């Protein structure tokens, strides 16, 4: 019981201190884990959070991601968690590479990826 409470507090602290880009990656982690566990509800919730957080003011990126998220949601509804997980892993890798490039440049402030707004609600906590 105590360990679970401590872990939850630690996770909340990570979320509070995370950059917008790190929040995107953390949401991917949760979506991938949910798909691997074949947790229908949490898979739908996390992928929907990624989709709903897209900033459509940047349609060049956002529309493509929107369509991929919709496709992943369709896969999950059909029980095809493997295809959804594969796609989410590829997208996560791309965002992680972006984060690594930014950190390598030693940028002190990281702005959110242009395709995302900055709110993910309580999906990560």
Can you name each region flagged by the protein language model?
Residues 1-52, 56-125:
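Surface/interface-facing alpha-helical segments and adjacent flexible terminal/loop regions used
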């Amino acid at each position: 019981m105590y360990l679970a409470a401590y872990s939850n507090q630690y996770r909340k602290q990570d979320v509070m201190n995370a950059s917008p880009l790190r929040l995107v990656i953390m949401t991917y982690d949760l979506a991938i884990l949910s798909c691997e566990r074949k947790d229908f509800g949490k898979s739908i919730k996390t992928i929907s959070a990624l989709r709903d957080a897209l900033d459509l003011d940047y349609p060049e990126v956002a529309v493509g991601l929107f369509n991929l998220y919709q496709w992943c949601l369709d896969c999950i509804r059909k029980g095809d968690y493997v295809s959804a997980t594969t796609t989410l892993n590829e997208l996560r890798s791309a965002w992680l590479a972006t984060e690594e490039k930014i950190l390598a440049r030693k940028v002190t402030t990281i702005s959110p990826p242009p395709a995302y707004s900055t709110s993910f609600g309580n999906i990560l906590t």
